[in-house]
Each structure stands twice: as structure tokens, then as C-alpha cells.
Amino acid sequence: METAKSSIIKFPSPRAKTPQRLRQADSLKYFNHTQIRMLRRAARDRAELDFKKGKVTGIREWMAIDLLISTGLRVSEAADLKCSDLKLGYGESKIIVNEGKGNITGHVVINDSLKKHLKHFLAWKEEMGEPIGEGDPLFLGQRGQWTAQAIQQIVKKYLKALKLYEPGKSVHALRHSYGVELYAKEKDLRAVQKQLRHLSIQSTLIYADVTDESISKQIKGLWQ
């Protein structure tokens, strides 16, 4: 049984900024709240248009982009997801991540909006005749399971169309954007560490050092 003493976890103070952390924060590449909303809207609009036309590309792309934005998953983790990694039953709202950094199996908690989207996506896949059982890939195209490189190119395509792309600021910046936004919402480093599955809280502290004006005030919900 856990004692009161053992349950106390001491974290480094976010205010104790070292020169190295300040340099990391200054170089952190992420998209602000408005830019993320633009990306979401563009991908969602493309999905709705493709659905009306009986096409499938935009539907898959919107799912991938929404997943990355709403979870902070690494692109390789998103590409490796199996349908059975989605725990969407009653009382469950999480995604199992089997090969995160450090080769440790973990999970990310998801919000109701993403849970609903994933459920609809699985139902759509089934209607399209795609397998959604144990071990079946979540993202499956005409050439097989999507690769991390394929998802990177999808994100890059949308960013370029929105004039948001710049070298070094692409798909992984979505993970940083999630970390920045999540910390701005509740100022809870432990929550950010758990969601991003950082092995050390030191990796998470960088998000506490970002002081961009766009994230200086509390928000009611992520990307809503």
C-alpha cells in the first residue's frame, strides 16, 4: 500500500530556469492556437468534401491530423497504431502506445471529441470493407499500412497550403504544440509528462518555459 510519504513526488520548479532550458524554450518549434485551428479546419473541410464525392483520401488524412493534434503522439507511433490499440468502450478513453521512446508500453488519455471521431472512423473503415480486428492497422491505404513518412508528407502538404510550413517545423511540431497547449491549460507538468510519456520530468519542463503571448491565458478546452 502506498504511504503518504511515498506518494509525494517532488518536481523541479518551473521558475528555476537554467540557461540550457531557456535556449531549448527559445528554439522550441510549435504552432499557436490559431494555427492549429486553421490546420484542423482545412483537414476537416477536405474530409467532408471527399466524403460527399465518395473519395477516401481526405477522410483518412483528417483522422491522422486530428489524432496527432489531439494526443501529441509521435508520427511513428501514430503510423504503428493498430485498431485494437484503441480503447473506446464504456468507461474507456485511451490509446495504447506500444513502442514509444524508450521502448516502454504506455497509453494516452483522449477527450470525448477524439473518441467520437475514432469510433466513426472505425465504423467507416468497416463499411469500406477494411479489417478492424486485432492487429489490423488503423491507417491503411491502397499500398498497405501508412508509414511515418507518408503521414509526414500529408501534414506537410496541409501546412504548405496554409502557408504555415517552414523547414524544421512540421509534423513533430504538432507534438510540441500539444505540450505547450496542455501546459497552458492547467499548468500541470505531471499531466503533460504522462500524456507525452516523457521518461524524465526534465524533458517536460521546457513547456513551462514557453512564454508566448498566445498561450499566456487559460483556455477552456484544447483546440475547441
Task: Label every PLM stretch briefly.
Residues 1-224:
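Conserved catalytic core of the tyrosine transesterase superfamily
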